[in-house]
């Protein structure tokens, strides 16, 4: 019988995700924290924490489904979650400060990371939402600009 109150952090190795994991580990109402990351190993600060299960995922639809199936096998009773993956820019995607900077490839990469992947998580996670409690999920997108960029007109 499922009796735990569990939480999930997707993109747990990023700055916001790591902070969410730290906060959830200190929450005594949560029994287990499942941290998902594209980084295979948990940061050293989380080693030997019996409350935490670190899970590797490449964020493809197939791997998201595999990860959720693992949560099901662990009888996850999800009451709280944070989906923190998203990109503002990376080596391949630069901020579009002019209309001419926009490319199909960069838009596809940004939309996939910030919109498609979170919805794929929700689609699969509905199977592990708590049956007895309300499950609260936050989706945090990285697609925001700095205040100084906004004063200059922002990004596209």
Region roles according to the model:
Residues 12-26:
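N-terminal Rossmann NAD(P)H-binding glycine-rich loop of SDR-like oxidoreductase domains
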Residues 25-44:
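Conserved glycine-rich Rossmann-like NAD(P)H-binding loop of the short-chain dehydrogenase/reductase
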Residues 27, 75, 124-133:
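A short helix-coil junction within the Rossmann-fold of NAD(P)-dependent oxidoreductases
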Residues 47-63:
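Rossmann-fold cofactor-recognition segment
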Residues 68-69, 122:
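Short-chain dehydrogenase/reductase
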Residues 70-90:
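A glycine-rich helix->loop->beta "capping" turn
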Residues 87-91, 95-115, 119, 134-156:
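Catalytic loop of short-chain dehydrogenase/reductase
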């Amino acid at each position: 019988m499922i009796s735990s109150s569990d939480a999930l952090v997707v993109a747990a190795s990023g700055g916001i995700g790591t902070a969410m994991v730290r906060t959830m580990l200190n929450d005594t109402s949560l029994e287990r924290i499942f941290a998902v990351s594209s980084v295979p190993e948990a940061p050293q600060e989380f080693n030997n924490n019996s409350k935490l299960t670190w899970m590797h995922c490449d964020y493809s639809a197939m791997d998201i489904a595999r990860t959720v199936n693992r949560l099901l096998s662990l009888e996850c009773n999800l009451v709280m979650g944070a989906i923190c993956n998203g990109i503002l820019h990376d080596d391949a995607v630069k901020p579009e400060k002019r209309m001419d900077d926009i490319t199909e490839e960069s838009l596809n990469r940004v939309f996939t990371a910030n919109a498609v992947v979170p919805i794929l998580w929700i689609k699969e996670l509905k199977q592990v939402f708590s049956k007895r409690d309300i499950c609260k999920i936050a989706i945090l997108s990285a697609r925001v600009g700095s205040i100084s960029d906004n004063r200059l007109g922002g990004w596209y």
